[in-house]
Amino acid sequence: MRIAVICFCLLGIASALPVKPTSSGSSEEKQLNNKYPDAVATWLKPDPSQKQTFLAPQNSVSSEETDDNKQNTLPSKSNEDPEQTDDLDDDDDNSQDVNSNDSDDAETTDDPDHSDESHHSDESHQVHFPTDIPTIAVFTPFIPTESANDGRGDRCGLRTEVKIIEVPPINVQSPDATEEDFTSHIESERCMSTKKTSRLTDHSKETNRCELSKELMPKAKDKNKHSNLIESQENSKLSQEFHSLEDKLDLDHKSEEDKHLKIRISHELDSASSEVN
C-alpha cells in the first residue's frame, strides 16, 4: 500500500511539471520541443529503486498516448500531403518499436549488473507524459524607424519631444465677398455704434438730472424760507389790525354810553327845573 501511495504521489508531481517529450513522439511534439526549448530545464529524475513500480503504469500511459496520437492524425490525412502522412506513419512505427524495447529493458531491471544505458533509456521513457507546455509570450523591443537627424543635433534614441506651437486661426476675408455681406457688416457696425451712443446719451441725461435736482434743492429751500417769512409778517400785520379794530370798537361803545348818560342827566335836570317852577 505504501508503494502504491508513493507511486500515485510521483505520478501527480510528474503530471504537474512540464516535461520534455521523447524523440519517439509524434511530429507535433517535436515541433513543440523546437519552439520551446526552455521548458526542458525542469526534468523529473526519480530514484532508480522505484523503477519497477513506476514503469508498469508508464507502459499503459504510453500505449494510450500513441493511440490518441493516431486518432488525432487520422482525420487530418485527407488535408495533408502523401509525403507528410508517410512520415507520420514511420514515426508511429518507430515509437511502437521504442516502447517495446523499453518494456524489455524494464523486465531486465531486476539484474544487479544493469548498465547505465538502460538507466538513461528508462529516464527518457519516464519523462514521456502528456503535459501542457506553458506558452511563453515573446516581447520584441520597440525600435524607432525614423532617420537619425545628425545634422540638426537631435537624436532619435533619446526620443526628444518637440513642442508644437498652436497658431490661432486668422479670419481672412476672401476677395470674392459679395456686396450684401459687406453692407450687412456695415449695418451691424452702425447698429452697434447707435446702441453705444444711445447708452451714452441716457447716461448723460441721468447725470444732468441728478445735477439739476441737486441745484434746485437749495433754491426750493430758500423759497420756502422766504415764503415762511412773508406769511409770518402778514400774520403779524393782521393781528395788529385786529387789535386796533377791537380798540376802536371799545372806544365807540364807551362814547355812546357817555352820550346816553349825558342825555339822561339833561332830561332829569329839565324835569327838576320844571317842578321847581
UniProtKB/Swiss-Prot annotation:
One Gene Ontology cellular component: extracellular space
Transport is among the record's keywords: no
Modified residues (Phosphothreonine): 178
Phosphoserine: modified positions: 23-24, 26-27, 60, 62-63, 76, 78, 95, 100, 103, 115, 121, 124, 184, 188, 204, 232, 239, 244, 255, 266, 271, 273
Positions annotated as glycosylated: 101
Name of this protein: Osteopontin-K
PROSITE patterns the UniProt entry points to: OSTEOPONTIN
Molecular-function annotations in GO: extracellular matrix binding
Polar residues bias (residue ranges): 49-63, 227-242
Function (record text): Probably involved in cell adhesion.
Start-end of Acidic residues biased regions: 81-95
Location(s) in or outside the cell: Secreted
Keywords of the record: Cell adhesion, Glycoprotein, Phosphoprotein, Secreted, Sialic acid, Signal
Cited InterPro entries: Osteopontin, Osteopontin_CS
PANTHER family tied to this protein: OSTEOPONTIN (PTHR10607:SF1)
Family, per entry: Belongs to the osteopontin family.
A single BP term in Gene Ontology: cell adhesion
Regions annotated as coiled coil: none
Originating organism: Bos taurus (Bovine)
